[in-house]
Structure formats: structure tokens, C-alpha cells
């Protein structure tokens, strides 16, 4: 068990600025003369699902900076974070086919996830909705979902995310900007670039309209900075 915002009593600790007034243990204060607060156990997340896009379009960019490489690093970081919180994590990769690693906890699961990520290749064009439809029966209602994808060349993204949100899932979309990654290797006329950026922004805005938290991940932004926006999960 770990401390957090749950219901079950975990331990007493010293009062810190910002602690809720109602969490003060007045009996402990009467005995010790020191302000102490009740710390509760964190309610465990049932499962965390990470969907990583490994389609052919994920190769856009340089050898080291492309949606697949950026996405693989992000998936490893997110899974490690939740496994260290003692949550269970599932990994789904989709490109030419879907690969599913069922949710588990612990270091062994972390190793399995890293092994699967090390083997990914950019190929295929499997749509996201086909993947989420196949996975839906295996996902408990309300499970947090991370979708790591450039979102390019897939018209099913919007309905897939709408369906996930409709089933109570907290959805985070971490999207490497393939338009900006492409600029690293080829010259895009300014007008064309601006049109493509506007189309992408409209797509991201539409996704956020379904309640998803959307991160437009630029090539020059470190993963840690991008993930600052999802700490509330």
C-alpha cells in the first residue's frame, strides 16, 4: 500500500503547509502538542493502458527524432512511472498488427514492456479504432488510457477516443508532431506548413473536446517537460 488520496487509514505524519484542515488528527495533537495529519492509502488504479502507434507513418523524421523513437521512449517512461506506483500496466502496440501485453505489476512486467518496446518497427497502417474495439472487452471501466501517436493518416482517431471517453476512461494523448519532425529532414514551403499545422491543431482541438488531455509534442521539447502536463493522472 502507498500513501495517497484514498479512504483507508495509512499512517500519521507531521502537518505540512497545504494539508487539508480536515485531515488533522486532533487526538494526536492533544497527546503530543504537535499537529499531525491522517494519511490515507492511495486508491489503486485497476489498470493503466498504453497504446503505442507503430504504423509506417511513425518513421517520419530523422533516425533519432521520429514518432516511433519518441513514442517508444515515452511509453517506457510512462509504464515505469505507474509500475513504480505499484499500479498494473498493459501495453498495446499497433502497426501491421496489434500486440497486447496484459496488465501486470512489478519489475518483471517492466522488463516485459521494455522488451516489447525494443522490438517495435514502423510498418503497417492498422487504424486506432480497430485496436480500441478489440481491446474494449479487456479494459475495466475508468482505467487511465495513454495514446502515443502522431495521429497522422488515421480517420478513426476521433471516434476511437470518443468511445473511450464515453466508457469513463481518462484519456491522455501524447502526440509527436510529425509535421515538425518532417521539417528536420525536408524543406516544407511556409504556406504548406501553416496549413498542415492548422489542420493538426483542429484535429487536436476536436480530440480535447471529448475530454481527452492532448499534448502536442514538439521535437525540441524534452519528454519530461511534455509529461508535466499529465501529472494529475
What residues fall within each predicted segment?
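Short, basic, glycine/proline-bearing loop/turn elements
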Residues: 23-24, 117-121, 143-147, 188-189
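Short, electropositive alpha-helical surface patch
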Residues: 101-115, 228-233
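A conditional alpha-helix N-cap/helix-loop micro-motif detector
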Residues: 5, 71, 124-128, 154, ...
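Von Willebrand factor type A / integrin I
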Residues: 133-145, 151-233
